[in-house]
């Protein structure tokens, strides 16, 4: 059983998630994006170590399948929001970078 303090903290946490969801919907609509496209761009620009991400990292952050994330990346490429580059360090990996248009979105 949760304590009162834990329940209050959980309630506040869920409230902040709901506020972020509302903000995300408004931000994605303002940019002409789907919410998932917006979140993917956010995860690329917000990567803690660099300004690009792999499809696997994006799938993990989005809590989506790698296959579904690859399809999302391809749709965003068609919209000129992102570009894929083969990794110089490891040719098996593909880096997903924001384009200028993706940065503006």
Residue ranges and their predicted role:
Residues 12, 19, 39-43, 104:
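Pre-recognition alpha-helix immediately N-terminal to the DNA-recognition helix
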Residues 1-31:
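N-terminal leader segment of winged-helix/HTH proteins
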Residues 8-11, 97-102:
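A ubiquitous short alpha-helical element
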